[in-house]
Each structure stands twice: as structure tokens, then as C-alpha cells.
Amino acid sequence: MSERVILAYSGGLDTSVAISWIGKETGREVVAVAIDLGQGGEHMDVIRQRALDCGAVEAVVVDARDEFAEGYCLPTVLNNALYMDRYPLVSAISRPLIVKHLVAAAREHGGGIVAHGCTGKGNDQVRFEVGFASLAPDLEVLAPVRDYAWTREKAIAFAEENAIPINVTKRSPFSIDQNVWGRAVETGFLEHLWNAPTKDIYAYTEDPTINWGVPDEVIVGFERGVPVSVDGKPVSMLAAIEELNRRAGAQGVGRLDVVEDRLVGIKSREIYEAPGAMVLITAHTELEHVTLERELGRFKRQTDQRWAELVYDGLWYSPLKAALEAFVAKTQEHVSGEVRLVLHGGHIAVNGRRSAESLYDFNLATYDEGDSFDQSAARGFVYVHGLSSKLAARRDLR
């Protein structure tokens, strides 16, 4: 078996320390793999050089922005996926893509071991390792942060002692994960639930309590569930996310302060920013309200929740998720049209929707002249619909 270790590299504290630590403690060569998911910040060339400076024998950078948008963000929209009705799976959907590219790098660079920098308290360890087991069960997994009980203080001390080029201090110990779909911030004083987030935590959104300028009205167009236009201009999925990140972020839309149930059994607090994601999910959900038949819509809302739970729990490659997506593909056949939304003061308000596939019938819905609804049929419908309840009540009154 090869002694090379293929490491999922973010450029942050834990994975930078991991490169040096693996080399010093095990003698194995490390190939660092950094994936560009549209996270912005440092240039990927800088991240690549940092990996080399930390001791990696090779550092691979993969531009996966379009792949991430089309293959991972889009399914999140199609499934209206909000874990616990709030979290749009910012980090969760990125992990299976990283796993895919780490496995590819292991095959290309002769690696028999894959490594990640996740702790034993988080969900990401599960997402990575279940992903590896699904795609490459022959690979060994190394998790130094978890298996050797690193704390952030220990990692910072190791970085300082070994001159690892990483900008993290004990006074600013936030853990940040970001991509084009959103941004997640945790640890530090945020671990105390009563502490309000400070302004410096946010990067994707403006302060909605200050920016009370002109509201931004945007029209998002869909074809078979897929976002295809913004204000009538054709866009790719990536371009749609980027445009709505910019516009919704300027209005303070997409800030989320969440206490969520982690897979490992604990509750954790996360601060999320996902302006474009929240606009797209809101618009898509609204268009489904117009185009899906009642029973289909009801059932899909159940599968939406289950899909979000599967992805959150690291089961991206599971048979159930694949089966749900086959169902969802069928539901999207008529989800075409446009939704108009107003973005302002941190809020999203839908104020218009139109679709050639709409099930809304004006003549049936109107209370004015032209009403074509046969109200004489209502009496019998109400009687039959409530008959079982009536019979049960009659029995209970005996």
C-alpha cells in the first residue's frame, strides 16, 4: 500500500497543522487537495503555496465552482432543502464533492490514505468518511484532529512552534467555512448562546438594521425547476447564485443564527450567511405552490425534509437519496415560470408569480363576476368529507 496521504486542504488552521503533523509524526508524504467552491477570500494560488510551505510534496487545486453549482447547489434548490426548516446545507453539500475529488487525487497520485481535519464533535467527519466508504472503501482514513484530540489552542501552539503560516489567534478563534452557496461561522464567544454576533462576523451580507435604502425587486425564472434567468437575463446556476448573493447580500438577506441538532447528538450554534441560496429556495418553493397538484405538493414537502436530513447526515451517496431524487425529477416537469421577489431590510417578500404550467384558475378562484365554481356541489362534498368524524362523534356521545 502506498504511504502517501491525500489531505482535504482548506488553507485554514487545522489542515495546515495536519500537513506538518502527518509528516513529522508518521513520516508519510502528504498531497494536499484544495477545492475552489467559489469561497472567495485568498487566491487559490496562495492556498496552494501555503500547503507546500507547510510540507506537502504536492498541492492540487481543483476549480469545481460550476460543478458545485450544478451538481450540488441545484439539487438543494430542487428539494427546497432547509435542515430544521432553516439551514440551507451550506457546508453539508460541499463535502461529497470534496470526497469525490480526494478519491480522484488518491488514484492519480498513488495515495492509499485519505485524511481530513475534522473534529470528533462535528458532522463533517461523518460526511467525509461515509463518502469515502461509498466511493472508495479500499482507502484508509486518517483523522488527526479527532483521533489525537487536538484543541484549537493546541493547534495554534503547534502552528506557532513550527512556524506554520496561518493567521489565527487565541483572541479570534472562529472556525469559518465558506463557498459560493454560503458561509458558516462557529466557536469562540458564539458558543455562549446569549452572546449576540458582532458585526465583524459577517462577510456576505450588509447589516439589515442599517441598510434601509431602496428595496431591490428581482424576478427569477425557472425551467423544470432549474433557475435559468434573473430579471429576464439568461444565467447559469453559478451565475444565478453569484448575482443573488450580491443583490440579496446588499439588502442584508440570508443571515441565520441557528442552534441545530448535530448528527453526533449535541446541539451547536452556527451563524450562517446564505443570501443567494435563500432567495433561490424561496422562489422555487413559491413556484411549486403554483404548479404542483395538491397531493403531490404535500408529499414532496415530506421528501424535501427527508432529503435535507440525509444530506446533513452525510448520506449523499445513499440509495434512499438517489430514489428520492428520481421522484423529485418527476415532480419538476411542470415547475416552469417566474417569481418576483422584493429584497429589503433582511427580508424576502414574494409579490408575484406567473407560469404557463400554473394550476391556478382565476375563474374558479374569483369571488367576483365570472365565477365558474359550482357552489351547489359544496354541500354534498362537505357532508361526505366529514362523515367519518360525525360517526365517531356520535359513537363517543353514547
Swiss-Prot record:
<protein>
    <recommendedName>
        <fullName>Argininosuccinate synthase</fullName>
        <ecNumber>6.3.4.5</ecNumber>
    </recommendedName>
</protein>
<feature type="binding site">
    <location>
        <position position="127"/>
    </location>
    <ligand>
        <name>L-citrulline</name>
    </ligand>
</feature>
<feature type="binding site">
    <location>
        <position position="123"/>
    </location>
    <ligand>
        <name>L-aspartate</name>
    </ligand>
</feature>
<dbReference type="GO" id="GO:0000053">
    <property type="term" value="P:argininosuccinate metabolic process"/>
</dbReference>
<dbReference type="GO" id="GO:0005524">
    <property type="term" value="F:ATP binding"/>
</dbReference>
<keyword id="KW-0963">Cytoplasm</keyword>
<keyword id="KW-0028">Amino-acid biosynthesis</keyword>
<dbReference type="GO" id="GO:0005829">
    <property type="term" value="C:cytosol"/>
</dbReference>
<dbReference type="Pfam" id="PF00764">
    <property type="entry name" value="Arginosuc_synth"/>
</dbReference>
<dbReference type="InterPro" id="IPR048267">
    <property type="entry name" value="Arginosuc_syn_N"/>
</dbReference>
<feature type="binding site">
    <location>
        <position position="175"/>
    </location>
    <ligand>
        <name>L-citrulline</name>
    </ligand>
</feature>
<feature type="binding site">
    <location>
        <position position="124"/>
    </location>
    <ligand>
        <name>L-aspartate</name>
    </ligand>
</feature>
<dbReference type="Pfam" id="PF20979">
    <property type="entry name" value="Arginosuc_syn_C"/>
</dbReference>
<dbReference type="GO" id="GO:0005886">
    <property type="term" value="C:plasma membrane"/>
</dbReference>
<dbReference type="InterPro" id="IPR023434">
    <property type="entry name" value="Arginosuc_synth_type_1_subfam"/>
</dbReference>
<keyword id="KW-0067">ATP-binding</keyword>
<dbReference type="InterPro" id="IPR018223">
    <property type="entry name" value="Arginosuc_synth_CS"/>
</dbReference>
<feature type="binding site">
    <location>
        <begin position="8"/>
        <end position="16"/>
    </location>
    <ligand>
        <name>ATP</name>
    </ligand>
</feature>
<dbReference type="GO" id="GO:0004055">
    <property type="term" value="F:argininosuccinate synthase activity"/>
</dbReference>
<comment type="pathway">
    <text>Amino-acid biosynthesis; L-arginine biosynthesis; L-arginine from L-ornithine and carbamoyl phosphate: step 2/3.</text>
</comment>
<dbReference type="InterPro" id="IPR014729">
    <property type="entry name" value="Rossmann-like_a/b/a_fold"/>
</dbReference>
<keyword id="KW-0436">Ligase</keyword>
<feature type="binding site">
    <location>
        <position position="119"/>
    </location>
    <ligand>
        <name>L-aspartate</name>
    </ligand>
</feature>
<dbReference type="InterPro" id="IPR048268">
    <property type="entry name" value="Arginosuc_syn_C"/>
</dbReference>
<dbReference type="GO" id="GO:0005737">
    <property type="term" value="C:cytoplasm"/>
</dbReference>
<dbReference type="GO" id="GO:0000050">
    <property type="term" value="P:urea cycle"/>
</dbReference>
<feature type="binding site">
    <location>
        <position position="272"/>
    </location>
    <ligand>
        <name>L-citrulline</name>
    </ligand>
</feature>
<dbReference type="InterPro" id="IPR001518">
    <property type="entry name" value="Arginosuc_synth"/>
</dbReference>
<keyword id="KW-0055">Arginine biosynthesis</keyword>
<comment type="subunit">
    <text>Homotetramer.</text>
</comment>
<comment type="similarity">
    <text>Belongs to the argininosuccinate synthase family. Type 1 subfamily.</text>
</comment>
<dbReference type="GO" id="GO:0006526">
    <property type="term" value="P:L-arginine biosynthetic process"/>
</dbReference>
<feature type="binding site">
    <location>
        <position position="260"/>
    </location>
    <ligand>
        <name>L-citrulline</name>
    </ligand>
</feature>
<feature type="binding site">
    <location>
        <position position="87"/>
    </location>
    <ligand>
        <name>L-citrulline</name>
    </ligand>
</feature>
<dbReference type="InterPro" id="IPR024074">
    <property type="entry name" value="AS_cat/multimer_dom_body"/>
</dbReference>
<feature type="binding site">
    <location>
        <position position="123"/>
    </location>
    <ligand>
        <name>L-citrulline</name>
    </ligand>
</feature>
<feature type="binding site">
    <location>
        <position position="117"/>
    </location>
    <ligand>
        <name>ATP</name>
    </ligand>
</feature>
<keyword id="KW-0547">Nucleotide-binding</keyword>
